[in-house]
């Protein structure tokens, strides 16, 4: 008994010490978990009397520190999301998801951010591609020298032919666009019959076999025009190319699965550098255009607009929305192509509009500018080939009016 009494105080003391250590370890583990995991409660509201689908919600992650993975739920349903590194510094800057809402609905979402792990994988609903030809590949739509970025010096003799399909291309289920890698930086269009992704299979060069299977193809001849909303300079009388430049870059910022982001970077043009960013969301036929300058450009005027498709009819609300509907050959190869009918549209916020120029034989032009170092606008189009789209100028112009009044002017409201 004496021996037991001798050791008891020591055992008791060691037991207390162990409990303190264990408690400290548990608290440290809890604190570590709390730091590694953050929860955001978000409410997304549809302000309109019509249901809305695939409405973009973008969360700035700057104040949340290191984020490597995210999980979004509404109730028990997991919602696909996407993390993007916008400035390409290997840290995610934005979280994006798409909301489906009934008329006037307010829907709650729970966002959990994780400091470890990797982004969750979801089915791709957009696609982007930048590549050079592989001399060993004979099929025109199976080239596989994929790039993420390419820069040409300003004195590059022929950047247009460096890249396969002549520039970066991207798509949602409803559209497909390529941007020429030259001084025009024009947007050329791919028309679809079915609502799906196709450019990975066709690479903008659809074979006869693919056409027989219902794949789409190039539907617009653009020449030196704006095509669909190319950003240009303005010399006081007419649009000018973004040229000469010190260098010209095309790069893909994000491949999806919910939005793809591509950028055109022009350095050393008229003493400014500019970045033209195109954002394509899944489920959308419209594309967001943001132009960023390296300094305020209040003293500069620029231009954009849409091509005057041969024989086209025009619509304008004279407040930034302009559209056309017309038919023309998309290529001089009349054996493998047919005349294509398209509807085009552009919508520019009124604060950027300096003038709306009268239509000429080539295009419908806006003169634009900004008091700071950023401006933005939206572009949109349809093909008459679509089984899911519009098939007359009246249908298309009515759609454009509704698109502006709802999607453009009344985006969903996000609170968190």
Model-derived features with residue positions:
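Solvent-exposed beta-strand/loop surfaces of large extracellular or lumenal domains
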Residues: 69-95, 310-329, 348-354
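Extended, loop-rich substrate-binding clefts of extracytoplasmic carbohydrate-active enzymes
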Residues: 212-283
